[in-house]
Structures are given as C-alpha cells and as structure tokens.
Amino acid sequence: MNKCISVLYFVSSVVVLCWAKVYERCELARELLEKHHAPQNQLSTWVCIVEHESQYNTSAVGRLGEGSDHGLFQISSIYWCSPTGNSCDISCDSLEDDDITDDWRCAKRIYAEHNDLAGDGFTAWAVYRPHCSGNTEKYLKGCFNESSVNENEENDIQLDLKNRANRKHS
C-alpha cells in the first residue's frame, strides 16, 4: 500500500511539473502588461509581490496553519480558493498551472476588495509592506524599452477615454 501511495505521489508531482512554469522577471512583467492589461502604474508592485511570494513559480504552494497559499500570487485557500471555489470561484489547484489568467483575475479581485476595506489593495499580501511598498521600479529594469511603455500608457488612456464616453451615452 505504501508503495502505491509513493508511486501515486511521484506521478502527480510529475504531472504538476509538466503544467507548471517558472517565469523570468521580465517575461512576467510583459505578460501582465500586454496579455492581462495590468495597470502600468502598478506593474512593478505586482512583479515585486510575485518575486517575494512565489519566486515566479506558478506551482508554488505555501503551507499555513489552517490552509495554504497557491500559485504565483500565493492566493489563500482559506478565503479565496478551495476545491469547490470560494470567493474567487476557483479551485486552488487551478492556480498552480502555467495559465495565469485565472490567477490574475483572482489577484485583481483580492486587490479590489482590500482596496475598498483598507484603502490599499496591496496590503492583502504580507510581503507588500516589507518589500514592495516603496520604490519598486527595479523590478521592471531592462524589461521594456521606453517607447513600448509609453505606447501602452497611451493605449490605456485612449481606452479609458473611450469607456468613459460609452458610459455617458448609455
């Protein structure tokens, strides 16, 4: 029986490793900005949080007393994810693969709720105050050429103006 459990554990570990990814710092910054449309003014803070929470590893799991933290953003099983969903309506296992779309969606939700409660959504992450509340620009150093960042900011401004205009006409 113990041999079967050991084999099962090994096989499940290999499967997780096949679906997991460890990002490079700039790779994550570019993906958050370009694919997931992270706000430019928050990008360095998000990258800092990921570095200190998971070391850019999508399969990271941190064990806590009653629960555990999962994925890049180390999202808590107590409040946000669970086998049946929880507040982010997501299983914790789905936060441990190489597709960070659901991780980002949940992280944004956590940020928004904590922003409403505490005035700073980043305080939901324990690493924020000691590591990421000051100047975090070093986390983006060498990741973008200046024109691509300015182009993304301009696109964000144009999109925001378009959304405001659409809301006025609705």
Say what each PLM segment does.
Residues 63-170:
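Catalytic and binding regions of secreted/periplasmic enzymes and modules that target cell-wall glycans
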Residues 33-36, 60-63, 92:
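Short secondary-structure capping micro-motifs at structural edges
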Residues 2, 56-59, 91, 99:
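Poly-acidic low-complexity segments
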Residues 2-57:
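Export/targeting segments at the very N-terminus of extracytoplasmic proteins
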